[in-house]
Amino acid sequence: SVTADNASETKVREIGQEKSS
């Protein structure tokens, strides 16, 4: 991912993990 999108992408991954959990 682009550095500028790193923060938002990390949040998306964290949210996805919480939902899958």
From Swiss-Prot:
Known pathway: Glycan biosynthesis; starch biosynthesis
EC nos: 2.7.7.27
Reaction catalysed by this enzyme: alpha-D-glucose 1-phosphate + ATP + H(+) = ADP-alpha-D-glucose + diphosphate
Protein name: Glucose-1-phosphate adenylyltransferase large subunit
One GO cellular component term noted in the UniProt record for this chain: chloroplast
Keyword Chloroplast: yes
Regulation: Activated by 3'phosphoglycerate, inhibited by orthophosphate. Allosteric regulation.
Top-level EC class as recorded in UniProt: transferase
Record's compositionally biased regions (Basic and acidic residues): 8-21
Subcellular location, record wording: Plastid, Chloroplast; Plastid, Amyloplast
Function: This protein plays a role in synthesis of starch. It catalyzes the synthesis of the activated glycosyl donor, ADP-glucose from Glc-1-P and ATP.
Membership in a protein family: Belongs to the bacterial/plant glucose-1-phosphate adenylyltransferase family.
UniProt-annotated stretches for the region Disordered: 1-21
